[in-house]
């Protein structure tokens, strides 16, 4: 909005010239989202606390230390969604189709998460909306997004780029749509499973969003994409602004979500953030890189899948003391802060490996 207004009304000023640069607008997006989080955070937390008498329901079979979290309000993801969307609307090019498609998915997944959080709070249990119902809604939204991308792109690509290999890509044909839906839904739920400790998911999300800010910028730039031998996708550079806003809003949220958390992001935040990262990876054709950069989310999800299947196959035996994996280490006696910080370190390593794929091929 601000970007479009400046370009349409102020042509020959230094300010207008600065707004031509995606890097400048991205930096400004981080500052704005951080500022909004710091200003609105206390107000939103107090408002959520007044509406939620018991806060987010805490599982009775979880680590004993989690019982100290009773009464902590949830739905803090509203803060992240609002600040990210506002900064994007202010600073991104609103004539860009990818911005609107991504915002549509971001908000839609946030609504699903909000409904789930609302059900948990009102029923005072941790079950919320049925898993199959959530998956169905996520699948429908992801399908709509994929159809929009197919329709709006003049020559939609169904290629799956393989990182670390030069000019290696797989043509999935129309099966790519099914794959893209799997990526978006899978990413949304993987982040959701990881969000189980104070601050645990927030920083890895910021690392992943920051990585895709760089990827979006490079893929959307003809010179850089040619130099790095990446698939050039025009207009994806504007997603850098959105990704930068996600980084700032996550860091701002961490201020209140660090142990001991004053608020949880809830499914409102985790489903929307995971979903938007999946959407951006599909648009930029870096779906496999998302699995690398977000390797922590993949590991957490894999631990749940392995636990469930092993439990059923052995009729009651478990691989881990508790799944997802972060609870396993808590049950082993690790302090929550130690689990969180060590998982952050792992997340940094995955992000560096994923980003190295841009050059190593």
Swiss-Prot record:
The prosthetic group or cofactor this protein requires is: Mg(2+)
Q: Which CDD domains match?
A: GT_MraY
Which of the seven top EC classes does this enzyme belong to?
Answer: transferase
Q: Name its pathway.
A: Cell wall biogenesis; peptidoglycan biosynthesis
Give the residue spans that cross the bilayer.
Answer: 28-48, 74-94, 99-119, 133-153, 168-188, 203-223, 236-256, 263-283, 288-308, 338-358
Question: Keywords on this record?
Answer: Cell cycle, Cell division, Cell inner membrane, Cell membrane, Cell shape, Cell wall biogenesis/degradation, Magnesium, Membrane, Metal-binding, Peptidoglycan synthesis, Transferase, Transmembrane, Transmembrane helix
InterPro entries, A to Z: Glycosyl_transferase_4 (IPR000715), PNAcMuramoyl-5peptid_Trfase (IPR003524), PNAcMuramoyl-5peptid_Trfase_CS (IPR018480)
Q: Tell me what reaction this enzyme catalyses.
A: UDP-N-acetyl-alpha-D-muramoyl-L-alanyl-gamma-D-glutamyl-meso-2,6-diaminopimeloyl-D-alanyl-D-alanine + di-trans,octa-cis-undecaprenyl phosphate = di-trans,octa-cis-undecaprenyl diphospho-N-acetyl-alpha-D-muramoyl-L-alanyl-D-glutamyl-meso-2,6-diaminopimeloyl-D-alanyl-D-alanine + UMP
Q: Which GO terms describe its biological process?
A: cell division; cell wall organization; peptidoglycan biosynthetic process; regulation of cell shape
Location in the cell reads: Cell inner membrane
GO terms assigned for molecular function: metal ion binding; phospho-N-acetylmuramoyl-pentapeptide-transferase activity; UDP-N-acetylmuramoyl-L-alanyl-D-glutamyl-meso-2,6-diaminopimelyl-D-alanyl-D-alanine:undecaprenyl-phosphate transferase activity
Regarding the membrane, this protein is recorded as: Multi-pass membrane protein
Source domain of life is Bacteria
One GO cellular component this record assigns the protein to is: plasma membrane
Enzyme nomenclature, EC number: 2.7.8.13
Q: What's this protein's function?
A: Catalyzes the initial step of the lipid cycle reactions in the biosynthesis of the cell wall peptidoglycan: transfers peptidoglycan precursor phospho-MurNAc-pentapeptide from UDP-MurNAc-pentapeptide onto the lipid carrier undecaprenyl phosphate, yielding undecaprenyl-pyrophosphoryl-MurNAc-pentapeptide, known as lipid I.
Q: Which family does it belong to?
A: Belongs to the glycosyltransferase 4 family. MraY subfamily.
> What is the protein name for this chain?
Phospho-N-acetylmuramoyl-pentapeptide-transferase
Q: Which organism is it from?
A: Rickettsia peacockii (strain Rustic)
| Gene name of the encoded protein | mraY
């Amino acid at each position: 909005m601000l970007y479009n207004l400046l370009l349409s009304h102020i042509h020959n000023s230094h300010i207008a010239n600065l707004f031509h640069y995606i890097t400048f607008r991205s930096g400004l997006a981080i500052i704005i989202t951080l500022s909004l989080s710091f200003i609105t955070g206390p107000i939103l937390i107090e408002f959520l606390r007044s509406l939620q008498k018991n806060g987010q329901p805490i599982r009775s079979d979880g680590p004993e230390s989690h019982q100290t979290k009773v009464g902590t309000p949830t739905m803090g993801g509203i803060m992240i969604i609002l600040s990210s969307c506002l900064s994007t609307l202010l600073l991104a090019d609103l004539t860009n189709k990818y911005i609107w498609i991504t915002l549509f998915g971001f908000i839609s997944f946030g609504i699903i998460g909000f409904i789930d959080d609302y059900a948990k709070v009102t029923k005072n249990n941790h079950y919320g909306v049925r898993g199959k119902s959530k998956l169905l809604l996520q699948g429908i939204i992801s399908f709509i997004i994929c159809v929009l991308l197919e329709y709006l792109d003049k020559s939609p690509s169904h290629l799956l780029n393989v990182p670390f290999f030069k000019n290696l890509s797989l043509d999935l044909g129309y099966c790519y749509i099914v794959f893209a839906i799997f990526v978006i839904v899978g990413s949304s739920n993987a982040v959701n499973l990881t969000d189980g400790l104070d601050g645990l998911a927030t920083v890895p999300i910021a690392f992943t969003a920051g990585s895709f800010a760089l990827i979006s910028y490079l893929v959307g730039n003809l010179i850089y994409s040619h130099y790095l031998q990446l698939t050039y996708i025009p207009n994806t550079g504007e997603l850098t602004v959105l990704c930068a806003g996600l980084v700032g809003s996550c860091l701002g949220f961490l201020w209140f979500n660090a142990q001991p958390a004053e608020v949880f992001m809830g499914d409102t935040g985790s489903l929307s953030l995971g979903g938007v990262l999946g959407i951006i990876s599909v648009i930029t054709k870096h779906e496999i890189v998302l699995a690398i950069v977000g390797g922590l989310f993949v590991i957490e999800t894999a631990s749940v899948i392995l636990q469930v299947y092993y439990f059923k196959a052995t009729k009651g035996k478990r691989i881990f003391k508790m799944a997802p994996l972060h609870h396993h280490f808590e049950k082993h006696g690790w302090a929550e802060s130690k689990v969180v910080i060590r998982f952050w370190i792992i997340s940094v390593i995955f992000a560096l490996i994923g980003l190295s794929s841009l050059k190593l091929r």
